[in-house]
Amino acid sequence: MGIHGLAKLIADHAPGAIKEQDIKNYFGRKIAIDASMCIYQFLIAVRQDGNVLQSEDGETTSHLMGMFYRTIRMLENGIKPVYVFDGKPPQLKSAELEKRGERRAEAEKMLAKAQELGEQENIDKFSKRLVKVTKQHNDDCKKLLTLMGVPYIEAPCEAEASCAALVKEGKVFATATEDMDGLTFGTNVLLRHLTASEAKKLPVQEFHFNRILQDIGLTSEQFIDLCILLGCDYCGTIKGIGPKRAIDLIRQHGSIEEILENIDTSKHPAPEDWLYKEARNLFLKPEVVDSSTVDLKWREPDEEALIQFMCSEKQFSEDRIRNGCKKMMKSRQGSTQGRLDSFFSVTGSLSSKRKEPETKGSAKKKQKTGATPGKFRKGK
């Protein structure tokens, strides 16, 4: 789910913290990607005939096609992707997962009704609501990435939290995900639409966390409280408090505790046994991968093993897979050039008063570390 309405709130209150970029601007960057979010996007994608991609025995293979071609697109643009897979969900997420189960059950009823009435638009809509990323989907994608020579990490808990930890450690440049809670976990840079379909022609949205805090006038702890008020995966929210009121209250009172002391709780009741403190602590001190124990390496693809897996087992076209392997090999030759800014050290910093700061300048030091050869170990 992420954080309700956070992207719009940032666009309204801190537009200077968002940059639109072309994918080619990330040449030489190491980027941590929320794998589950990607796989979900690939699974709900439908072809022009309205059907998902399947093998002859009816097994869905949309996730493999998406992972293969989107990863190649990133490699061709000089990006060094590392996929981060979710571990066990935190206990605080159990209520949210229960709600999702209820919504899925309701979607099943609505789907059956739409099928009975022959309403194709509703059939498509409710079918997507039933999509769930399974262990098999994850295992398929991990095998594919290994054969492609692309590293992945298994997070101990939430993938976005481990992505953010890698960014904060200066190990990668950014977190790529569609969920905005990567910012709540403190990633310095968050990228949206990096793995979107090329056909959609969506520019990459680049959010800068420190600039967001500066422009909306909050500390990182206050930003977490704001996100809890907006609505997150780990607890409920105060009734009747929308985004505009939430940011006004945080600016005025500074914390959820002070807000509860000063609002009319008869009009704006908080949830019973509200676990906002636990949610805050989860954002502040999440269970994350130990970046000192991982060593990321990008290797040559194993072409024959890819043919065996993707063609013999999953029935993809051999010509297309071999062509993809050629593109990967070619991209490896080009990526050795590296980023120009990795050869220079930077002194001083840009003034915070600048209206439109150049993203490359304002993040150069972090980008420099993100572009250096890895000190990671591939998570297995």
UniProtKB/Swiss-Prot annotation:
EC number: 3.1.-.-
Region described as I-domain: spans on this chain: 122-253
Keyword Electron transport: no
Top-rank taxon: Eukaryota
Post-translational events: Phosphorylated. Phosphorylation upon DNA damage induces relocalization to the nuclear plasma.
Keywords from the UniProt entry: DNA damage, DNA repair, DNA replication, Endonuclease, Exonuclease, Hydrolase, Magnesium, Metal-binding, Mitochondrion, Nuclease, Nucleus, Phosphoprotein
GO biological process: base-excision repair; DNA replication, removal of RNA primer; retina development in camera-type eye
Region (Interaction with PCNA): 336-344
Protein name per its UniProtKB record: Flap endonuclease 1
Lineage of producing organism: Eukaryota, Metazoa, Chordata, Craniata, Vertebrata
Gene assigned in the entry: fen1
